[in-house]
């Protein structure tokens, strides 16, 4: 399998990261995960724009253009003949002697590779369970940082509880999942946390809200309480790899009817239609 390493395509076995790379020692970097459908990188423009924004927020200057990077990623997908799956893209600040502060002139290290994804069809159709947990992450969740330690810890707790996701609560309000955005439906209105530094503005989130507007589905960007979450008619989550998944129980409590609801199904259908439309190759 070929990987992209600092602008070059090479075998994965040939790729070597320096032990003093700041991404390795500090998690000093940013990343994106992009879904591949029909050999096409879905919402590529939005992912790359967010990568550059995240990099700028932490002071990483990318010397290459967005167009150059997109071209390299498309070539990577083609050379690996990856028709369906995902692409992981990471940028670190670069290598330097280990100390917290960083000097000028570091060269960012860019890596990318493709991987298979098994579409969570059963979960999308039947729904999943979730737990809640205190949101104790740092206050710049809008940056897609490599620092995911708390997310990892809480996601592991969810797995140990036989749950698919953990929904995070800060000051009594629902923020997001450990690796997803969260939506609460009540009386035919879909609520989701507004775009602030407390959540990552997910690419699938952006697409879903666009599709809600186009399909006449009512939504409001408003934080809801934990009680409102537990007493919702419907709850669902979105992410690049999960797409749209209904949540039918939280902390052992049944949500709504205990089955995927009509609003969730409408959002699922709208997203699938958008994916098919945007990744259809013309002859």
From Swiss-Prot:
Keywords of this entry: Aminotransferase, Pyridoxal phosphate, Transferase
Names of the cofactor(s): pyridoxal 5'-phosphate
InterPro entries hit by this protein: Aminotrans_IV, Aminotrans_IV_CS, Aminotransferase-like, BCAT-like_C, BCAT-like_N, Class-IV_PLP-Dep_Aminotrnsfr, D_amino_transT
Keyword RNA-binding belongs to the record: no
Protein residues bound to pyridoxal 5'-phosphate: 50, 176
A GO MF label: pyridoxal phosphate binding
EC assignment: 2.6.1.21
GO cellular component term, pick one: cytosol
Record PTM N6-(pyridoxal phosphate)lysine, positions in chain: 144
CDD domains, per database record: D-AAT_like
Reaction equation(s) it catalyzes: D-alanine + 2-oxoglutarate = D-glutamate + pyruvate
Keyword Transferase carried by entry: yes
SUPFAM superfamilies: D-aminoacid aminotransferase-like PLP-dependent enzymes
GO BP terms: D-amino acid biosynthetic process; D-amino acid catabolic process
Disulfide feature: none
Binding site for substrate: 31, 98, 100
Active site positions, chain numbering: 144
Family to which this protein belongs: Belongs to the class-IV pyridoxal-phosphate-dependent aminotransferase family.
PANTHER family: AMINO-ACID AMINOTRANSFERASE (PTHR42743), D-ALANINE AMINOTRANSFERASE (PTHR42743:SF10)
Assembly behavior: Homodimer.
Function, in words: Acts on the D-isomers of alanine, leucine, aspartate, glutamate, aminobutyrate, norvaline and asparagine. The enzyme transfers an amino group from a substrate D-amino acid to the pyridoxal phosphate cofactor to form pyridoxamine and an alpha-keto acid in the first half-reaction. The second half-reaction is the reverse of the first, transferring the amino group from the pyridoxamine to a second alpha-keto acid to form the product D-amino acid via a ping-pong mechanism. This is an important process in the formation of D-alanine and D-glutamate, which are essential bacterial cell wall components.
Name the UniProt record assigns to this protein: D-alanine aminotransferase
Naturally occurring in which organism (per UniProt): Bacillus licheniformis
């Amino acid at each position: 399998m070929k990987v992209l390493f600092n602008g070059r395509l090479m075998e994965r076995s040939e790729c070597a990261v320096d032990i003093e790379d700041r991404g390795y020692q500090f998690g000093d970097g940013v990343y994106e995960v992009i879904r591949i459908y029909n050999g096409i990188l879905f919402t590529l423009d939005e992912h790359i724009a967010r990568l550059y924004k995240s990099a700028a927020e932490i002071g990483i200057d990318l010397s290459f253009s967005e167009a150059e990077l997109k071209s390299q990623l498309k070539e990577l997908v083609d050379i690996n003949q990856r028709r369906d799956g995902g692409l992981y893209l990471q940028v670190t600040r670069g290598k330097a002697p280990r100390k917290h502060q960083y000097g000028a002139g570091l060269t960012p290290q860019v890596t990318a590779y493709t991987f298979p994804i098994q579409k969570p069809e059963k979960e999308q159709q039947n729904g999943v369970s979730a737990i809640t947990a205190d949101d104790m992450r740092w206050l710049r969740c809008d940056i897609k940082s490599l620092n995911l330690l708390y997310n990892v810890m809480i996601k592991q707790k969810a797995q140990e509880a036989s749950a698919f996701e953990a929904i995070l609560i800060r000051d009594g309000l629902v923020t997001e999942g450990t690796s997803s955005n969260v939506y609460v439906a009540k009386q035919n209105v879909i609520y989701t946390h507004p775009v602030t530094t407390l959540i990552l503005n997910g690419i699938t989130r952006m697409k879903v809200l666009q599709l809600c507007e186009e399909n006449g589905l009512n939504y409001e960007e408003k934080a809801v309480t934990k009680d409102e979450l537990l007493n919702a008619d419907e709850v669902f989550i979105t992410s690049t790899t999960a797409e749209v998944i209904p949540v039918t129980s939280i902390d052992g409590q049944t949500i709504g009817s205990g089955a995927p609801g009509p609003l969730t199904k409408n959002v699922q259908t709208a997203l699938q239609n958008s994916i098919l439309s945007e990744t259809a190759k013309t002859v």
